[in-house]
Design a protein with these regions (language model features):
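Glycine-rich phosphate-binding loops of nucleotide-dependent enzymes
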Residues: 2-243
């Protein structure tokens, strides 16, 4: 299906701290990828670099064959990259529908909604995440599980090709995690390329066919979950076992 994302020797330093250290990998179009590592491993910084909210110290980012390293966030959204955040921050006093409509105003969102209208397109997105019955209420009264769904709906609004999901299972009950797992499966089946940064391994390892492992800013492993969990370096880095 072709490569959609290429990360080449990507490095990000904050003063004397190297948060991402010479990371390289490629993502095929339509892939479903897990990104794991202990706290401080560099997962969120890597997402920030891909999404454009941080600038790399060295290296490059290629999307659909275009070098987007110097592109600002809004231009990357227009190219087809969208993300969620660990801490959900909806526009609290707009309705859930209006939160999604804001994202639909991007060029890709407008193009996708041209035949049906932006409000109908936004409603379709809310329905796809199971929130159509909450369309007219403000997110400040939503339970946390629904806020996580709204976060995904907002990311879908600009009609992305690549979705970066930052800890979508965090803070959820097992039942709520299962709902999000099924939603992610559905989105991947619809053709979205998805990278999930997560520390809840039980759900993630059963969901994705490929896992990237980061530790101290470095990419230390890349492969199927069954292989990853048996690599000594991964066990030591993630579980704190060994010397």
């Amino acid at each position: 299906m072709g490569t959609v994302l290429q990360i080449k020797n990507l490095t990000k330093r904050f003063g004397g701290l190297t948060a991402v250290n010479d990371v390289s990998f490629e993502i095929e179009r339509g892939s479903l990828i897990g990104l794991i590592g202990p706290n401080g491993a560099g997962k969120t910084t890597l997402f920030n670099l891909i999404a454009g909210s941080e600038k790399p110290t060295n290296g490059s980012i290629w999307f659909d064959g275009v070098n987007i390293t110097k592109y600002r966030t809004h231009k990357r959204v227009n190219y087809g990259i969208a993300r969620t955040f660990q801490v959900v921050k909806p526009l609290r006093f707009l309705t859930c529908l209006d939160n999604v409509i804001v994202g639909c105003m991007s060029p890709r969102g407008k193009a996708r909604s041209e035949n049906v209208g932006i409000e109908q397109y936004a409603s379709t997105i809310l329905a796809s995440v199971g929130l159509i019955d909450k369309a007219r209420i403000p997110p400040i009264i939503l339970p946390f599980g629904d806020l996580k769904k709204l976060e995904i709906a907002k990311a879908l609004a600009p009609n992305p090709e690549l979705l970066l999901l930052d800890e979508p299972f965090s803070g959820l009950s097992h039942e709520e995690q299962t709902i999000i797992v099924n939603l992610i499966k559905q989105l991947n089946e619809e053709g979205y390329t998805i990278i999930i940064a997560e520390h809840i391994l039980r759900e993630l390892m059963a969901l994705v066919p490929r896992v990237l492992v980061m530790h101290q800013g470095k990419l230390i492993a890349d492969g199927p979950p069954k292989e990853i969990v048996n690599i000594k370096l991964v066990i030591e880095a993630y579980l704190g076992v060994g010397n």
